[in-house]
Amino acid sequence: DYIDLGVNEVVLASADNTFSALHEFTGEEIKEIVEECHMHHMTVTVLMNRLYSEKDIYAAQKEMEEILHLGVDGLMFADPGLLKYAKEKHLECYLTYRPETLMTCNEDALFWKEQGLRSVVIPCLLTKDEVMDIAKYTPDTTVIIHGSTLMSVSKRKLLSAYKQVNQKDFDVHSKTLSLKEKQREAYMPA
């Protein structure tokens, strides 16, 4: 039971509004989950972290407002078009900026916090040192500690493909593999 484990927040993905969710929820499902979670003193945050095209942004803005009216405690976003609309409606205090790749330093994080947001999520694709630097200088940040979600959600066999294309010899199931970019000193777990 998650409550016994100390879980105090549930993050849900809104249908058609994220690119990294394993399951997406409808408005009616979100409403039911909010009621259940609030009964157990847990907060509910909805993920709307995709970037929207010109033809989709206005519908997404309206949907964001509808989701917030379902009683959720917050909403995670990536598209500045959602922030613009939220500011017009005085809803920015419910928002958490959650870019998957667009924030790379504490100045980025501080900029988003200065927009009146609830929080920012430090991207899990950064190195541990980069994450720690951003968290050190930016108050009220969220750090994802369970690993790189984007690669795992994609279900692509990236290590196997790399091994085959580059004719390398290593165990793709090894727990000790890491990646190193040319311009960074730190290693990232694979």
What are these regions (language model features)?
Residues 1-101, 121-190:
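Active-site pocket-lining/capping segments in soluble small-molecule metabolic enzymes
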Residues 103-105:
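Intrinsically disordered, low-complexity linker/loop segments enriched in Gly/Pro
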Residues 109:
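Conserved N-terminal glycine/acidic-rich loop preference
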Residues 116-117:
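As written
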